[in-house]
Amino acid sequence: MKKCLIVDDSRVIRKVARKILEELKFDVDEAEDGAAALEVCKRKMPDAILLDWNMPTMSGVEFLRALRREPSGGKPVVVYCTTENDLTVITEAMGAGANEYIMKPFERETVVAAFTEAGLV
C-alpha cells in the first residue's frame, strides 16, 4: 500500500483529503505544518505528499526545500494544494520540487486526476 502524507494546517482539509486518499487505497499520515511534516518524513518517508502553501511554523515551500536537501529525503511525489492562484506561487512551488499543483477548495476528481497524472493511481 502506498503512503501519503497530508500537510495542511486546516483540520477540515486534512479530513476531506484523507477520505479521498483512503478511497484510493493510500495509507495516510497527517501533519499540521512543515516542521511536523519533516518529523513524519524522518520516521517514514511517504510515496506522496499533499502539501499546503501557507502554514504556520514552516511554509509548504520551506518544507519542500528542506525535504529535497535531505540526502535520505527520497523523492516522494508532491502535489501542491493552495488557494493561491498566482503564477509566482506556482512557479516557486514547481521550482522547489512540486510535481503537481491543485487549487483549494478541491473536488475529489481534481485530487484523483493529480495523483493519476503523477503515476500514483
PLM region spans:
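Short hydrophobic/Thr-rich beta-strand motif most characteristic of the beta2 strand and flanking loop
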Residues: 25-32, 40
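Active-site beta3 strand of CheY-like receiver
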Residues: 44-50
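Receiver (REC) domain active-site loop signature in two-component systems and cognate sites
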Residues: 55
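Alpha4 helix (beta4-alpha4-beta5 surface) of REC/receiver domains from two-component response regulators
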Residues: 62, 85-100, 113
